[in-house]
Amino acid sequence: MLFRSVRKLLASADGLIENFKPGTLEKWGMSPEELHKINPKLIIVRVSGFGQTGPSANRPGFASIGEAMGGIRFINGFPNTPPPRFGISLGDTLTAMFAVEGFLMALFEREKNNGKGQIVDAAITESCFSMLESTLTE
């Protein structure tokens, strides 16, 4: 019943943002391929700890792990001490911003060019890693 209601909503939606462990939508019979059969214009934003593909994709992830593995915890704190947590959930915030940027770019592409939906993959670890910029060269 719930999935039927969700599918009905998605038939006319511009986008879906999900933050489940990779493979969850597929287990529910709601893979991007299935959802695009219902609505070819649907933009699907998939947020996870490590992305939808790769060796760590099936691992659950959350901000503190993404911050550590993405490297931004390294730049916080003092030498010879473990890196402390940030005062905010920086990994979640960064990933949300990148996810929205991806959604907006997919929406722009859909409206300007082909009329088709896309899949946007936003990973906490990659979002954090992208903030290292000049730190990597030091």
Pin down the residues of each PLM region:
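An anion/phosphate-binding loop that grips the pyrophosphate of nucleotide cofactors and donors
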Residues: 13
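Acidic, glycine-rich segments within the central catalytic cores of soluble metabolic enzymes
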Residues: 69-138
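N-terminal Rossmann-like NAD(P) cofactor-binding subdomain of oxidoreductases
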Residues: 18-74
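Short, small-residue-biased leader/transition segments that mark boundaries at the very start
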Residues: 1-2
